[in-house]
Design a protein with these regions (language model features):
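Extracellular glycan-modifying ectodomains
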Residues: 1-202
Length: 202
């Protein structure tokens, strides 16, 4: 309600819209299908549904989420604001800091020539986020700008893989939240979109 009121009371805002979409839409924690997962029990312990409406299936809840998300985005646009949509950040299924520490602790020789890079399947990312991409991509408006975090981490330094670190930086704070270094990369992309908006406004 506070956010809605703020958007009503102010004009020509640039709104950055991002959240972890996958877990709410799929109701499962992340499994990288290579031996690492977010939780031992992958089933999400709660789900989203409209107030005073009891849903009976995941498909029904997904439809409500889709309708609600599209409605909220259109509401922001129709109030005259510009919107930067930030798509799903790749999930890793483990804490890369702990992973690298354990690697170093048990086998320091691995670090003699280079730093091991932890990565996950880009295909797994695409499959898991297919629905949210379809929903966000279906909303077309010249006032919408888009940022794709996966283009920073996936299919870049390693083909068909999403990386959690490189030789110099660890991009994740834990299994799915970006570190300061990782966040800076995404924020730089957001700022590029904001600059485009400001150039058009002048």
């Amino acid at each position: 309600i506070k956010i809605d009121n703020f958007l009503k009371e102010n004009s020509n805002l640039i709104v950055v819209f991002h959240q972890s979409w996958a877990v709410s839409l799929l109701e499962t924690y992340f499994d990288n299908e290579e031996g690492y997962n977010e939780r031992s029990d992958l089933e999400y312990e709660s789900h989203l549904e409209p107030i005073k409406i009891k849903t009976s299936s995941l498909k029904e809840r997904q439809q409500y989420i889709k309708e609600g998300l599209i409605s909220q985005i259109n509401k922001i646009i129709n109030q005259g604001h510009k919107l930067v949509l930030v798509y799903q950040v790749p999930e890793m299924g483990l804490n890369p800091r702990r992973y690298l520490f354990r690697k170093y602790f048990y086998n320091k020789n691995l670090f003699k020539n280079s730093i091991p890079v932890f990565s996950g399947s880009y295909e797994v990312y695409k499959n898991r986020n297919k629905l949210i991409f379809e929903i966000l991509d279906s909303i077309e408006n010249p006032s919408i700008y888009r940022v794709y975090p996966h283009t920073l981490f996936c299919d870049t330094t390693i083909r068909d893989r999403c990386v959690a670190n490189d030789e110099n930086n660890i991009f994740y704070y834990d299994d799915d939240h970006l570190s300061i270094q990782g966040s800076k990369l995404v924020v730089d992309e957001i700022m590029k979109e904001i600059e485009k908006i400001e150039l058009k406004s002048n």
